C-alpha cells in the first residue's frame, strides 16, 4: 500500500512543478486537467505526510521509554500517537478507494409523484425545494428543464439540471422512493396519509460519454401549454425527442426558444441513455457479487419523512433525525455525508474480503 502512496506523492510533487510552469499556465485546458489531478491527490498526500510525522514521533517516544524520568510522559504520548496512527491508516485506506469517475459531474434531477395523488405532487414540490436550497448552500446552479404542475400545487413530474463541482458525489445516494406521512390540509378527520415520490439522480452525460446517431432520433415540435392545458406560446417552441432504439422520450417547453428547448431535451436524453447503461452495468456487477451496494435502485424505499413526529428516517443506514423542518429547508448535509461514509466503508469491506 505504502509503495503505491510514495508513487502518488512523487506524482503530486511533479504536478506542483508543472502547475508553476509558464508553458502550462498558458495552456488553460491542460492547466485545468492538471489542477484537477492535483486536487484529487491533495487529501491523500496530506494524510500520508501527517502519517509519516506521527511515525517519527512514535519512534522518538519509544526511545524515551528507556529513560525512567521520561517513561510516564512517553507512555501517555505514545498511546495518543498510536490512536492517531490507526485513524490516519483508516483515512488513507478510504482515500485509496477507486474514485467514481462521475463524482465531479453535474446531474440531472428527476422527481416524480407516485402513490398519493395530489398529496404526492405537493411532496414532489417540497422535495424539489429541499434540493434547491441544498444546492444554493453549495453554490450550485439549478435550472428547470421540464415541469408538469399539479392543479393543487406541486409537481406530477419535474426535471432539472444541477450544475457545480462534485454534485453527483453528494447527491448520488438520493435516488429511490421517498415516502411522506402527514395530515393533508383537506383532511377533516386529522388522519395521517402516506404518499410517495421517486427521485432519480443521474450524472450529466458529456459528448465523450455517449455518441447518438442523429438518424436514431425522431424530433417533434409543438406549442407549449400551461398547467390547465391552455397554449401559452403562439409558436411551435416546445420540443419532443424520441430515441428510437431505446424508446426514450424527452420533452421540453420551458424556454421560449425552440433551439434552447431542443438543447435541453438533448442533454436529458443523453443523460437518461447513459444512466440506463450504468444501471445495467451495476445490475451485472451486483449479480456477480450477489448483493447490490449503493446502486441507487429506483424501486427501493430509501427514506420516510414523518411530519407529525418531525422525523426523517433513512432506512438504508438506520439514520433517524428529529429535525424535519430544517431538513425540508435544505439542511441535508448530515444525511448525504453519512451515506457517503457508509458506502465508502462497505466498499472498503468488500475490498478487504476480495484481497
UniProtKB/Swiss-Prot annotation:
The gene is prfA. Its main location: cytoplasm. Belongs to the prokaryotic/mitochondrial release factor family. It is found in: Cytoplasm. The modification N5-methylglutamine is found at residue 230. Keywords: Cytoplasm, Methylation, Protein biosynthesis. One of its GO terms (cellular component) is cytoplasm. Peptide chain release factor 1 directs the termination of translation in response to the peptide chain termination codons UAG and UAA. This is Peptide chain release factor 1. One of its GO terms (molecular function) is translation release factor activity, codon specific.
